[in-house]
Amino acid sequence: MKHIRTRFAPSPTGYLHIGGVRTALFSWLFARQNNGAFILRIEDTDVARSTQASVDAILEGLRWLQIDWNEGPYYQSQRMDRYREVIEQLVKSDDAYRCYCSKERLIKLRNTQLKNKQKPRYDGFCRDKAPRQSNEPFVIRFRNPVEGAVVFDDLIRGTISIDNRELDDLIIARSDGGPTYNLTVVVDDWDMKITHVIRGDDHINNTPRQINILHALGAELPHYGHVPMILGPDGKRLSKRHGAVSVLQYRDEGYLPEALMNYLIRLGWAHGDQEIFSREEMVQLFDISAVSRSPAAFNPEKLLWLNQHYLKTVSPTIIAEAFATQLEKAGTDLRNGPSLEQVIALQAERTKTLKEMAQRSLYFYQEVRSYDEKAARKHLLATIVEPLQRVRERLASLPSWEKEAIHEVIVETAQLHQLKLGQLAQPIRVALTGDTVSPPIDATLYLIGRDSALKRLDHAIRFIHQGMG
């Protein structure tokens, strides 16, 4: 069997969004399950719009998702001499020709065709004319066959046939000599021995054109697979308001790479009713031919559900570094406070993203200087001073700082003062966290630590006394 070689070829003219990542994932999975190679290529011939920042973001996004590549990144901007060489080869073999048509003529031609309800296309005006000896500007067009059809078996869509009469003579070199997209892609796939081109279905109209150029070069054709687009929940093309943002924004919002990978593989592909896939299962089970031909709808709630699943199931050690980043972004000093792994284990059931987890965990690492106004009015009352004082004294005298012992102190104090457990736990929670939401109060006290907990209880008692005065 021929050695499988796939590629991902983004343009660095913007961010790497989830549609591009899904295409990269499918291509990467196909290579991995066939013991093949996954090649990364940066299509940066659009010098005006390509930026190094975009290149860096693409590489960083792929690394975050652990979509690793065997070769590259190759840069088209470094291969210009090779493209010119192939263009010259096509001209010499009479598979390409100079076109001197002015912009005005082409605009007039297009308007006439539209007026006559015809498909806008080049009419071949320069196709059979000899090259001029003047210094007039020209482009180079590929001499597309006028008979027959381009037929190929798409890995996802099955057999596709395009009549050559539907295709005009596309430009392969601009008037400044620069190669166009359809030429560079063909040369790269040929030179890099790509066996399977898996890409978005927005490229499907380019495929017959590229196949004809490959035929003219005497090159072996790769297999093609065109992945349907991702739509928003409203059925419209995915936009920023739906979630078509940089993949790194998902990282910054506290999503886990495992969750995003799992979500994207299920967008348009299924394996029975299975929802959760490990990376190993993805490689083993993914089937490119089983990808749906219909567009997939992006569901942010499903992604959140998956993210929470992974927060609960991934080892806290694995996500501790990302959690630390979120806490530091929130302005927290991590030198004081419990271990990150302990907080993750405690908060994973209660939060859906690492960012939310960090926002809800700040009180573990910084003193509480103020209270939510509504929470303080409801729970930090004069009637609770004595029970709080009792809790403070009992906690201070515990021989060891253990959750079970802490729990006993709260239960016994509530019974002593004829309070329901919640009537005592909520004021303690407000004193410790500044608000009414936290994990179980014994676990919260345990992680905050004895010294800090006692200080916070003292602060709350003073706060109540000041209010009484």
From Swiss-Prot:
One of its GO terms (molecular function) is glutamate-tRNA ligase activity. Its EC number is 6.1.1.17. It comes from the Bacteria. It is found in: Cytoplasm. Pfam families: Anticodon_2 (PF19269), tRNA-synt_1c (PF00749). GO terms for cellular component: cytosol. A motif ('KMSKS' region) lies at residues 237-241. Its cofactor is Zn(2+). Zn(2+) binds at residues 99, 101, 126, 128. A motif ('HIGH' region) lies at residues 10-20. It catalyses: tRNA(Glu) + L-glutamate + ATP = L-glutamyl-tRNA(Glu) + AMP + diphosphate. The keyword Ligase applies. One of its GO terms (biological process) is glutamyl-tRNA aminoacylation. SUPFAM superfamilies: An anticodon-binding domain of class I aminoacyl-tRNA synthetases, Nucleotidylyl transferase. Binds 1 zinc ion per subunit. ATP binds at residue 240. The keyword Transmembrane does not apply. Its main location: cytoplasm. Keywords: Aminoacyl-tRNA synthetase, ATP-binding, Cytoplasm, Ligase, Metal-binding, Nucleotide-binding, Protein biosynthesis, Zinc. Belongs to the class-I aminoacyl-tRNA synthetase family. Glutamate--tRNA ligase type 1 subfamily. Monomer. Catalyzes the attachment of glutamate to tRNA(Glu) in a two-step reaction: glutamate is first activated by ATP to form Glu-AMP and then transferred to the acceptor end of tRNA(Glu). NCBIfam families: gltX_bact. This is Glutamate--tRNA ligase 1. It comes from Coxiella burnetii (strain RSA 331 / Henzerling II).
